[in-house]
Curated annotation (Swiss-Prot):
Glycosylated. It comes from the Eukaryota. The lineage of its organism: Eukaryota, Metazoa, Chordata, Craniata, Vertebrata. It comes from Walterinnesia aegyptia. Belongs to the phospholipase A2 family. Group I subfamily. This is Non-toxic phospholipase A2. Relatively highly potent phospholipase A2 that displays potent antimicrobial and hemolytic activities. It does not show cytotoxic effects on the three human cell lines tested. PLA2 catalyzes the calcium-dependent hydrolysis of the 2-acyl groups in 3-sn-phosphoglycerides. It shows similar potencies on both Gram-negative and Gram-positive bacteria: B.cereus (MIC>9 ug/ml), B.subtilis (MIC>12 ug/ml), E.faecalis (MIC>7 ug/ml), S.epidermidis (MIC>12 ug/ml), S.aureux (MIC>5 ug/ml), E.coli (MIC>7 ug/ml), K.pneumonia (MIC>8 ug/ml), P.aeruginosa (MIC>10 ug/ml), and S.enteric (MIC>9 ug/ml). The keyword Disulfide bond applies. Keywords: Antibiotic, Antimicrobial, Calcium, Cytolysis, Disulfide bond, Glycoprotein, Hemolysis, Hydrolase, Lipid degradation, Lipid metabolism, Metal-binding, Secreted.
């Protein structure tokens, strides 16, 4: 999958939070 569910605090570096959900967000290349 292009996007991978991760905790918000893990959306760092080359990843951006692209869709907020209840316990985190979907992260993708950015």
């Amino acid at each position: 999958n292009l996007y991978q569910f991760k905790n918000m605090v893990q959306c760092v570096g080359t990843q951006l939070c692209v869709a907020y959900v209840k316990y985190g967000c979907y992260c993708g290349p950015g």
